[in-house]
């Protein structure tokens, strides 16, 4: 089975690229989806997050207040590392399970949609690495306008990830997403042909 890593900095359009690949029939293993699942009410990771960051990160319905957690976890490298130490081992375990299941089911290509693929050195375990690239100012603009995040928060999150240059060095294929959605779709036709 061909393992393809898909990554890009926050706001790069990586999820849009994953959706385009999924619509072409590729299996997507989504690290963000797994990250959401492991912190659902009743999951051990949620209790550990409450212990680490306080009960105020829980909504009245018992679910995780993601913005509340982000406000505490992305204040500095130490707090980000604490968040990662709780969530990343569980994400890795579930990811490995899904890859094994895909291979057992005869899947030919599995794409791992992982924001921190290069940050965590997981690019080395992939057969091919796709990096979605967008300049920082465009990423900030998109996240402020489309997700309603504050500019300061966005820049903190960007700064908590590896620099774009490091991510680009790990790329086998760079997907330029500085243009429109139509431009991205045109770029993706070439990428899909390579896969």
Swiss-Prot record:
It catalyses: 3'-dephospho-CoA + ATP = ADP + CoA + H(+). Its main location: cytoplasm. GO terms for cellular component: cytoplasm. It comes from Corynebacterium glutamicum. It comes from the Bacteria. It is found in: Cytoplasm. Belongs to the CoaE family. One of its GO terms (molecular function) is ATP binding. InterPro entries: Depp_CoAkinase (IPR001977), P-loop_NTPase (IPR027417). This is Dephospho-CoA kinase. Pathway: Cofactor biosynthesis; coenzyme A biosynthesis; CoA from (R)-pantothenate: step 5/5. Catalyzes the phosphorylation of the 3'-hydroxyl group of dephosphocoenzyme A to form coenzyme A. The keyword Iron does not apply. Keywords: ATP-binding, Coenzyme A biosynthesis, Cytoplasm, Kinase, Nucleotide-binding, Plasmid, Transferase. PROSITE patterns: DPCK. Residues 3-195 form the DPCK domain. The gene is coaE.
């Amino acid at each position: 089975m061909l393992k393809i890593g898909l990554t890009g900095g926050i706001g790069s359009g990586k999820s849009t690229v994953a959706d385009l690949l999924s619509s072409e029939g590729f299996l997507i293993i989504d690290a963000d989806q797994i990250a959401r699942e492991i912190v659902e009410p009743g999951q051990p990771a949620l209790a550990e997050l409450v212990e680490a960051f306080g009960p105020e990160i829980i909504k009245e319905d018992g679910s995780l207040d993601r913005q509340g957690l982000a406000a505490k976890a992305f204040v500095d490298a130490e707090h980000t590392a604490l968040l990662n130490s709780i969530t990343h081992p569980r994400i890795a375990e579930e990811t490995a399970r899904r890859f094994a299941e895909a291979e057992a089911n005869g899947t030919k290509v599995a794409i791992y949609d992982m924001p921190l693929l290069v940050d965590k050195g997981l690019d080395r375990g992939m057969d091919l690495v796709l990096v979605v690239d967008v300049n920082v100012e465009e990423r900030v603009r998109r996240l402020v306008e489309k997700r309603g995040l504050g500019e300061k928060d966005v820049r903190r999150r960007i700064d908590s990830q590896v620099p774009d240059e490091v991510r680009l060095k790990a790329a086998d294929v760079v997907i330029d997403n500085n243009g429109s959605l139509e431009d991205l779709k045109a770029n993706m036709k070439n990428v899909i042909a390579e896969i």
